[in-house]
Amino acid sequence: MQQERDHKRDCCKLMPQTVKAFFKCLRFRRSSSSSSDMVKARARNEEKEEPSSIETSTRSLNVMRKGIRKQPVSSGKRGGVNDYDM
């Protein structure tokens, strides 16, 4: 246990002061974000979701088209069975 604590302290010492200050700034920004900022962020996220839903629907249509497409009739070269009557 003592060795793990010492190791954690060493890791923290390796991190420069500027990086620590940067993380503190990020934490402060997150905690200080007002409710109006949250509403704006939600509105932006909703706007971004609409095109993605359209993209997924077009993708699903493309997948369905591939499934509807008939498989080519085997020529019999590899031992396949022909669908048509001779």
Swiss-Prot record:
Biased composition (Basic and acidic residues): 39-51
Sorted UniProt keywords: Plant defense
InterPro entries: PEP
Region (Disordered): 31-86
GO process terms (BP): innate immune response
Pfam families (UniProt xref): Pep1_7
Residue stretch(es) of the prosequence: 1-59
Record-annotated site: Required for ligand-receptor interaction: G76
Domain of life the protein comes from: Eukaryota
UniProt family annotation: Belongs to the brassicaceae elicitor peptide family.
Function text: Elicitor of plant defense.
Protein name, per record: Elicitor peptide 5
Name of the gene encoding the protein in the UniProt record: PEP5
